[in-house]
Amino acid sequence: DYRKLFKNNRQFQFRFYFGKFLWNNKSYDNFRNYLGRSDGYLLLDEYLGRSESTGLLSQQFIMAGGGFKSIFENPKSNDLMIATNINIGLWKWFEGYLDLGILKDKDQKTRDFYGTGIKLNLLPDFFELYFPISSSNGIEIDDYRYYNKIRFVLSYEVDSLINLFSRKWF
């Protein structure tokens, strides 16, 4: 994860993820790379609704795996995943984001994914909202149930709070 804050108070953030299973096979296929929300089987992620598949708590976003904010059908791989996430400051708390990724399952064709949108960075790394605009699914904002696609970050880790208030605000 690389972040750069420019003198005009705009931020650039770049993240790259590469995951490859060397010994995963079809008979023992318990481990996978995920584009977005992981299954959190180790219980290390701070999900508010870990087992939620619908509703507000299912929309929580934690930067893990491919870091995608859009929700896709079958967004996982048992072999290879390459992903990058780019955020660019637009104006005050508004940032544009771009997610690009490639998934490859064993004995399957490669699948390409992308997602773009606007990030409302209210409290960096603590409370953020992601509004998808376009993705491999098509134009996201046209969906009549668009509110189900909005993702949020809400961190309750003490380290996040300390980092939040130790930054220069003025």
Describe each PLM feature range:
Residues 4-10, 88-94, 121-126, 158-162:
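Outer-membrane beta-barrel strand-turn architecture
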Residues 120-126, 146-170:
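Outer-membrane beta-barrel "beta-signal"
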Residues 88-96, 103-110:
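Intrinsically disordered, low-complexity segments enriched in Gly and acidic/Ser/Thr residues
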Residues 12-16, 94-98, 118, 127-129, ...:
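Transmembrane beta-strands of outer-membrane beta-barrel proteins
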Residues 4, 18-25, 98-106, 124-126, ...:
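Transmembrane beta-strands of outer-membrane beta-barrel pores
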Residues 10, 76-82, 110-116, 121-123, ...:
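Residues that define the transmembrane beta-barrel architecture of outer-membrane proteins
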Residues 1-89, 105-106:
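C-terminal outer-membrane beta-barrel translocator/porin domains of Gram-negative envelope proteins
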